[in-house]
Regions:
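Short catalytic/ligand-binding loop motif for oxyanion handling, primarily in non-cytosolic enzymes
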Residues: 54-58, 101-108, 201-204, 251-255, ...
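C-terminal beta-strand-rich structural cap/linker in extracellular carbohydrate-active enzymes
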Residues: 526-541
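Hydrophobic residues within beta-strands of alpha/beta enzymes
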Residues: 46, 193-195
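Loop/helix patches that line or flank the sugar-binding groove of alpha-linked glycan CAZymes
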Residues: 4-5, 216-217, 227-229, 233-236, ...
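Acidic/aromatic-lined carbohydrate-recognition and catalytic surfaces
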Residues: 2-183, 187, 200-253, 261, ...
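Beta-strand-rich binding/interaction modules
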Residues: 505-522
Length: 541
């Protein structure tokens, strides 16, 4: 039995959450200090992005030691206190495991570079000459996916940054190291794990050029990935714990296999297809208006497909890699509150486990930076250079980055209207959104009609109503590009969810039998015969 159906996970990016010592960086003591805020929201788990020792080339996703705490975030004692204090409030901690690659500063990689054959086999090294990469694969961060090491006469694979060397999962010693890391953290009282890009760990037997793409078809959901996951879960002793896999460019069929209960792999999956509907020609760094019909079709395919075959979805709009949803799919000006609440309803009533990213419950927006110097994200800085080389103007380039950068969601949590939004008494590591005096936790905590109070209601309803956590789902009006509509039902209760995706009034179609249904929830105080801009309504019978 999946015990996580009525649970809600809150994602924390520690670097930007709360700074307890005034150095400008969020830390573990900062998280502990805000546990009452999180307990009040009603969330069950906190997923913390990596706080392990790291050169911070990719904000901690370049891990140099999987069993320690980076001094910038505090000490192991701070973490143990956080685990204890969270536990006392009925909240479990989930850690982020970056198992596809390590930092090139990791002890294993240093030994590999020093010529140690054992540790070279921990990574993917290929013999070659400096003028010819082993394949033409492209890194996810731009540029070649291989780096040459002259004194070894070898190339190593890095699907991400050049300082993130891919691990060789074909090597049983690597797989045992990963399982041992899970055992270590489980013994510390960690209650769950999120696995970073876990579906790219299984590489091909033969490395060949990709003349149709960037190489991803050769390693995405690779030939041994299900075998490796089953082994990792069993050897790590984590079967039955809450686990979520970040799945890059995956398929519905694979995610069913990853999450079906009898397979003993993961409890749920993140997939990102619905967050690519505003990519022009599938390209992240090319802008277009969101294709809501495509988004609806994706929701329906994944929701109904997972339901039919026993899979389980993670539900989300936001994370540390995505722009803020209210800026992206809503309005962060005129209809800020309405669109933030509509987007919340759209996914919180679906079949799956909802994830709330820090500040999402406040309606935090993109910061709308205007200078490249304001950005810290390695991907954004790389693409600034690439886009300028493609002859895009400075203004065009900055507009694209302002809408697409991972830094959009990494600006500090807006706690109150004081200097630096109450995040730090020092100089923050990255700038704070200018609107923090209006959009902050203190302003919303006790306001019954705030976005935060709305989120609190959504969390409580999932716990109270089995139809939300365990009922079936059926999508309605699939060809209506303005309206997301679906029905939840379980034999006792029925819910009808209607979400206006547009910044204008639209018709409000009601299926037969719903005219006199009770209004469970809405983001406008009264009821109308139409759906007003970004209006959502949930009916019950």
């Amino acid at each position: 039995m999946n015990d996580f159906k009525d649970k809600v996970v809150y994602q924390i990016y520690p670097k930007s959450f709360m700074d307890s010592n005034g150095d400008g960086f969020g830390d573990l003591k900062g998280v502990t200090a805000k546990l009452d805020y999180l307990a009040d929201l009603g969330v069950d788990y906190l997923w913390l992005t990596p706080f392990f020792p790291s050169p911070q080339r990719d904000n901690g996703y370049d891990v140099a030691d999987y069993r320690a705490v980076d001094p910038r975030y505090g000490t192991m004692e701070d973490l143990e206190e956080l685990i204890r204090e969270a536990d006392r409030r009925g909240i479990g901690l989930m850690l982020d495991m970056v198992f596809n690659h390590t930092s090139t500063e990791h002890e294993w990689f240093k030994k590999a570079l020093a010529g140690d054959k054992k540790y070279q086999d921990y990574y993917i090294f290929k013999d070659g000459t400096p003028d010819c990469c082993p394949t033409n694969w492209v890194s996810k961060f731009g540029g070649p996916a291989w780096e040459y090491v002259p004194w070894l006469g070898k190339w190593y694979l890095h699907l991400y940054d050049v300082m993130q060397a891919d691990l060789n999962w074909e090597n049983p010693a690597v797989r045992e190291e990963m399982a041992d890391i899970l055992r270590f953290w489980k013994a510390k009282g960690i209650k769950g794990f999120r696995f970073d890009v876990i579906n790219v760990i299984s590489k091909p037997e033969v490395y060949e050029d990709d003349f149709e793409g960037d190489g991803r078809r050769f390693y995405t959901d690779g030939r041994n990935v299900h075998k490796y996951l089953k082994e990792l879960v069993a050897a790590g002793g984590i079967d039955g714990m809450i686990t979520v896999g970040e799945m890059s460019s995956t398929t519905l069929e694979n995610c069913i296999d990853y999450t079906a209960e009898g397979n003993h792999e993961l409890t749920m999956c993140f997939n990102f297809h619905h967050l690519k509907v505003d990519y022009k020609d599938g390209q992240k760094w090319e802008l277009r208006e969101p294709d809501y019909l495509a988004m609806k079709k994706l929701f329906q395919t994944w929701q109904e497909g997972m339901q039919a075959h026993g899979g389980w979805n993670a539900l989300f709009w936001c994370n540390h890699d995505q722009p803020r949803a209210v800026s992206r799919f809503g309005s962060d000006t005129t209809y800020w509150k309405e669109s933030a609440e509509m987007l919340a309803v759209a996914i919180h009533f679906m079949r799956g486990t909802p994830y709330i990213y820090q500040g999402e419950e406040l309606g935090m927006t993109n910061p709308h930076f205007t200078k490249i110097e304001q950005y810290r994200d390695v991907e954004s800085l790389n693409y600034y250079r690439i886009l300028r080389e493609q002859d895009k103007t400075e203004a065009e380039t900055l507009d694209i980055i302002a809408q697409r950068s991972r830094d959009d969601s990494r600006t500090p949590m807006q706690w109150d209207a004081s200097e630096n939004a109450g995040f730090t008494t020092g100089a923050p590591w990255i700038g704070i959104a200018d609107n923090y005096k209006a959009i902050n936790a203190a302003a919303q905590m006790d306001a019954p009609d705030s976005i935060r109070s709305f989120y609190k209601t959504l969390v409580a309803l999932r716990k109270k109503m089995p139809v939300i956590s365990a009922g079936k789902i059926e999508f309605l009006y699939p060809d209506n590009a303005d309206l997301l509509a679906y029905r939840r039902y379980d034999g006792e209760t029925e819910l009808l969810v209607l979400c206006n995706l547009r910044e204008r009034e639209i018709a409000k179609p009601l299926p037969v039998g719903w005219t006199d249904a009770e209004k469970l929830l809405g983001n406008y105080p009264d009821t109308a015969d139409t759906l007003r801009p970004y209006e959502c309504v949930v009916l019950k019978k």
